[in-house]
Amino acid sequence: MSTPSLLAIGLGNPGAEYEDTRHNVGHQVIDGLSGRLDISLQHQSDALVGWGRYVDQKIGLAVPLTYMNRSGDAVAGLRAHYDLPIDRLLVIVDDLHLPVGTIRLRPTGSSGGHNGLAHVAQRLGTTEFSRLRVGIGNDFPEGRQSDYVLSPFTDEQRPAARSAREDAEDAVLTMARDDIDAAMNRFN
């Protein structure tokens, strides 16, 4: 298999009960891309993975089947299985520090308090991987963060959340076609 231009991995929790939650926005972005690119995701170890082409670039899409806080196991496993250079990985996550409707793409960085990203960094042994954060807002009472991230967007938030997911999909495609700098210039 030729080396892909990008393997985009959307973090979230497995199971229908989490499908439409804020915490699963990474999965939702991958679902949108798989539909747009007609890429079917197949079970492989502890992830769903699919491969296809965008323009003239090979692109991979994946969603871990592990819970968010154990996402690093799946990400590290995929990287090892496909012998991918770290700069070919893009991890997509929810971010409660960003307003609903916004995205932020970075080539490296901290976990920002996100347990899924922290576990990915731990298992990869580095923070030098690209990440795409999709804003979910933080409109919750003190001590209710878990309830907030594990609930769906409100009716008022849905249009902005949908727009952010579409922007995130476009950012992934821009990164696959061009590079992360082009995607950051367009979407940050």
Curated annotation (Swiss-Prot):
Assembly and interaction partners: Monomer.
The UniProt record lists the keyword Cytoplasm: yes
Site feature (Stabilizes the basic form of H active site to accept a proton) residues: 94
Locations listed in the record: Cytoplasm
Gene from which the chain derives: pth
Protein's UniProt name: Peptidyl-tRNA hydrolase
Domain of life: Bacteria
Sorted UniProt keywords: Cytoplasm, Hydrolase, RNA-binding, tRNA-binding
GO cellular component: cytoplasm
EC number(s) given by UniProt: 3.1.1.29
